[in-house]
Amino acid sequence: MQHVNHSSFDKASKAGFIIALGIVYGDIGTSPLYTMQSLVENQGGISSVTESFILGSISLIIWTLTLITTIKYVLVALKADNHHEGGIFSLYTLVRKMTPWLIVPAVIGGATLLSDGALTPAVTVTSAVEGLKVVPSLQHIFQNQSNVIFATLFILLLLFAIQRFGTGVIGKLFGPIMFIWFAFLGISGLLNSFAHPEVFKAINPYYGLKLLFSPENHKGIFILGSIFLATTGAEALYSDLGHVGRGNIHVSWPFVKVAIILSYCGQGAWILANKNAGNELNPFFASIPSQFTMHVVILATLAAIIASQALISGSFTLVSEAMRLKIFPQFRSTYPGDNIGQTYIPVINWFLFAITTSIVLLFKTSAHMEAAYGLAITITMLMTTILLSFFLIQKGVKRGLVLLMMIFFGILEGIFFLASAVKFMHGGYVVVIIAVAIIFIMIIWYKGSKIVSRYVKLLDLKDYIGQLDKLRHDHRYPIYHTNVVYLTNRMEGDMIDKSIMYSILDKRPKKAQVYWFVNIKVTDEPYTAEYKVDMMGTDFIVKVELYLGFKMRQTVSRYLRTIVEELLESGRLPKQGKTYSVRPDSKVGDFRFIVLDERFSSSQNLKPGERFVMLMKSSVKHWTATPIRWFGLQFSEVTTEVVPLIFTANRGLPIKEKIELTTTGD
């Protein structure tokens, strides 16, 4: 997934328009497959609905899309870009310095977005495959729901299996396919609307408000739980800002919105014209002439796959950002594409696959999945509203205006949350359990890092310059390596982790010409790549601080190569000639990276709650990427040393020598 050129961020182009259709609108664009079906089924079936119910339902959909998707996300949230990047974690990095507790909505919003993403592929692909039930030549096969489940699972297996290869060339087809999809939605919806053109009266919000309080609405205000299905993809629209640019979203959204609304109007008109067609039919597929049904099912399946692909890729991006912000475990990541936007995280991929397939097997039909869908994303939207309010205050918008906006969207999304909360007992508990599990892991990881930062023992490097210099010239010890590089998470000024000096001096002393201490600082900007060097008045100690954006890969060896060359050219680092080398012009000696595998000991003197957090973090750490992979050191010379995580000077436990008194005979 390529990122938009920053110079064209606010501009729109024909190519950008098509790309946006393939990346941004998959989720919201496939909602017509199941939203109207959910509304009708909750009312008792096609034969039970009235014209006022259809008008009210379409009106609620139109105004939900207008208020939440258009106003909140397209017009307001897209302004909250972090150096042209969007999404809840990008928004968090913009405002996190305002108050520490903003980590709470960021963690909750990220976890619920990730958990809801596991349900989306299940419901969209199942809905598309169920369309085969109305294909005359295939009805005898797919009327059996077991065959629908088998086909859905097969598609999902293929989808998740190819993630490791990246989207590559096939990704270029997503935009044109989705253009055809939206064109079909608009045209078919318009043609079906001619049967009952009064459906266009639904643009008047009166019909929606009337339905909410009408006795013929069997669900009452809880009908909004089904209405919300129409706008679940709004958060993904904001998350993909960096991939397509603000200008292309502004231009493409009106086209998408009109196509979606026409589809709902067309389905509504068909229902009014065919009230005796049967309660089990999906209005979306039933409204298509039978000779085109097979083609539409194929197109719908492709659209569902593209929507699922966008959400899976979005999940990888979301987790990558959280890992670099140090609020999520550092799982192994690979980069199958040629650009920074394509990330593949095996653990997350197969976690999502397991959850998605389990949901298909548990709920079996798209109707049952819809009953669980949307609950978590309402929480994500509420968390985004909180963070967005702080962003607007930071930008100088009047507090009164921000408060009004926060109250308006808070109440609106709060109502949708309450309406969706009824889904908890109908399957919504699944995504809530997943979200709570993710939140638990994020809290453990975040709190564990804070505990280490608070208690870990640091030493002043200046106090050890003399010892390091003496070791360099001590002929009793053989040269360990020309350059020894320590990667540290903790370096504050001249203070470094005690474990590092323990490794150099207290174990077998590591004699080297140059000692490197490298620390990575993640910046609030997404694509920063800068460094600072402090040699502490020597030519044998190099402190390097790498400033990398939260979307940048932390491949230390490649950055260090550039830094070494620049230090040699400036004369700050003495040339290190090699006697033996295939490169006669080589100016630098060999490098050995030392990775310290810090192990927490339960004997550390911590409070019970802190001990629990550290023990849990140690358990989670077994599943994470090794530092060698995380820092891109697979092809470098690396030594991994197991060291204790030193919080305080470990005092010996109290013990007394047992002295036996001996008696001597008289």
UniProtKB/Swiss-Prot annotation:
Subcellular location: Cell membrane
Stretches that traverse the bilayer: 16-36, 58-78, 99-119, 141-161, 167-187, 221-241, 253-273, 292-312, 343-363, 373-393, 402-422, 424-444
A GO molecular-function annotation: symporter activity
One Pfam short name: K_trans
Classification via InterPro entries: K+_transporter (IPR003855), K_trans_C (IPR053952), K_trans_N (IPR053951), Kup (IPR023051)
Any one of the GO CC terms: plasma membrane
Keyword Transferase appears in the UniProt entry: no
Catalytic activity line of the entry: K(+)(in) + H(+)(in) = K(+)(out) + H(+)(out)
Keywords: Cell membrane, Ion transport, Membrane, Potassium, Potassium transport, Symport, Transmembrane, Transmembrane helix, Transport
Membrane topology: Multi-pass membrane protein
Family: Belongs to the HAK/KUP transporter (TC 2.A.72) family.
Job description of the protein: Transport of potassium into the cell. Likely operates as a K(+):H(+) symporter.
Protein's name in the database: Probable potassium transport system protein Kup
